[in-house]
């Protein structure tokens, strides 16, 4: 029998906790036998004194097991259960293509996603833009769509990781969100509760990233890879670039359109293609669908080019209550903003740098993102045709198109976009799309 205050005292004094002590504390979070004040104190003690890898693994497993852990054995799936998670960015529409692409190659992707907050967009918000699509289906429907389509992208259900829900809301109010140990456990407890065979983690780096520096992003990526593998799930983390908008657009309905154009081959933004392929190929290798990256990329290009990935996307949309002809007639079902107008630069030269976070906040200003949880969204607004770094810019060539509902919103977003994209006479240094892979063997 342990006492919550003794566990807090031990961590306050910089000592390592045992797995049993951590399990006891997590149980207390779930059953409310540990008070809000004690959870806040524990969070602050971890923030200042950190946790070693064994502690992080114990915290992740304890939180994962605080609710239902999905099990896919009874469905008789003939492929691996695989998934991807991103730390979030601007124009990060990868999940919408990656899930169907991996499923079309023989994987099963039960993707439990979140909504956007602050400057980062949320995968669920993009699906909420689709008429009829259920982001909170029954567990029976979720399982049915995973089995039949190979992929289902939904929101977190109430019975998954209740400990994280309570802990996170307290961390949010007590300034302990930025702890790598606690971020690792929060992300992974949710992902591993989906009963995965393998996971690929996309950790963003740059001006639109969640972490403030490359070093912090790398530390988080290493922590996630070590803890997930330590908890028994094959995992690789990729560090990818978020120094500019990833797709050609940012918003909700506009990103759904870009995903469809990508899947059908209408248009594939080269940077988006590189990051999507890098993540998806790693999923196939970890899941045993491909022997190596070259074979994985060949399989992925095949399902893109023969239309199978697009077909899977359509099947998932229809299976979760959306239109049956969504791929062919998406413009009938997606909302459109009243004002769609270009924004021009006052300078000529090259797009030299981008404050990606500010561009994400411009989407929030338009009504396409949240300032606080629970805010209602306008799914039609956003940015499209955003220029890429290194692109030649003249005063008569738009740096982006703004989709707004009112003239005032347009003007506010126009100012934000102009301020966020810096034009200079010289070309910027080219950044890689993928900085590095952190695999189990690298730990």
Swiss-Prot record:
It comes from the Bacteria. Pfam families: Glycos_trans_3N, Glycos_transf_3, PYNP_C. Pathway: Pyrimidine metabolism; dTMP biosynthesis via salvage pathway; dTMP from thymine: step 1/2. Keywords: Glycosyltransferase, Transferase. GO terms for cellular component: cytosol. PANTHER family: THYMIDINE PHOSPHORYLASE. The enzymes which catalyze the reversible phosphorolysis of pyrimidine nucleosides are involved in the degradation of these compounds and in their utilization as carbon and energy sources, or in the rescue of pyrimidine bases for nucleotide synthesis. Belongs to the thymidine/pyrimidine-nucleoside phosphorylase family. This is Thymidine phosphorylase.
């Amino acid at each position: 029998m342990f006492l919550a205050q003794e566990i807090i005292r031990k961590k306050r004094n910089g000592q390592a906790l045992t797995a049993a002590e951590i399990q006891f504390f997590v149980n207390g979070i779930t059953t409310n036998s540990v008070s809000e004040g004690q959870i806040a104190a524990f969070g602050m003690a971890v923030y200042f004194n950190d946790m070693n890898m064994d502690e992080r693994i114990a915290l992740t497993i304890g939180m994962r097991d605080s609710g239902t852990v999905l099990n896919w054995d009874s469905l008789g799936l003939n492929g691996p259960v695989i998934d991807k998670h991103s730390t979030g960015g601007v124009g990060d529409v990868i999940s919408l293509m990656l899930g169907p692409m991996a499923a079309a190659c023989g994987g099963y992707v039960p993707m439990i996603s979140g909504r956007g907050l602050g400057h980062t967009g949320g995968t669920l918000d993009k699906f909420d833009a689709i008429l009829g699509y259920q982001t909170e289906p029954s567990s029976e429907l979720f399982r049915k769509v995973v089995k039949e389509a190979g992929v289902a992208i939904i929101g977190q259900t109430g019975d998954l990781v209740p400990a994280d829900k309570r802990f996170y809301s307290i961390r949010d109010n007590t300034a302990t969100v930025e702890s790598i140990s606690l971020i690792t456990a929060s992300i992974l407890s949710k992902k591993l509760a989906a009963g995965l065979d393998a996971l690929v983690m996309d950790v963003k780096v740059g001006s639109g990233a969640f972490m403030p520096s490359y070093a912090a992003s790398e530390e988080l990526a290493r922590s996630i890879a070590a803890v997930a593998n330590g908890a028994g799930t094959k995992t690789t983390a990729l560090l990818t670039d978020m120094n500019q908008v990833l797709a050609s657009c940012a918003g909700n309905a506009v990103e759904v359109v870009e995903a469809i154009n990508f899947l059908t081959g209408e248009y594939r933004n080269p940077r988006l293609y590189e990051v999507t392929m890098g993540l998806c190929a790693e999923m196939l290798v970890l899941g045993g669908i491909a022997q190596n990256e070259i074979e994985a990329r060949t399989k992925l290009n095949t399902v893109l080019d023969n239309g199978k990935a697009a077909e899977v996307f359509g099947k998932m949309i229809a299976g979760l209550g959306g239109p049956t002809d969504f791929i062919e007639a998406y413009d009938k079902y997606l909302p459109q903003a009243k004002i769609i107008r270009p924004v021009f630069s006052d300078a000529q030269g090259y797009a030299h740098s981008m404050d990606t976070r500010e561009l994400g906040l411009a989407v929030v200003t338009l009504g396409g993102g949240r300032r606080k949880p629970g805010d209602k969204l306008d799914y039609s607004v956003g940015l499209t045709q955003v220029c890429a770094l290194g692109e030649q810019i003249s005063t008569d060539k738009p740096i982006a198109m703004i989709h707004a509902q009112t003239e005032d919103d347009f003007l506010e977003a126009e100012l934000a976009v102009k301020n966020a994209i810096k034009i200079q006479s010289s070309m910027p240094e080219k950044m890689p799309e993928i900085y590095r892979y952190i695999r189990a063997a690298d730990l």
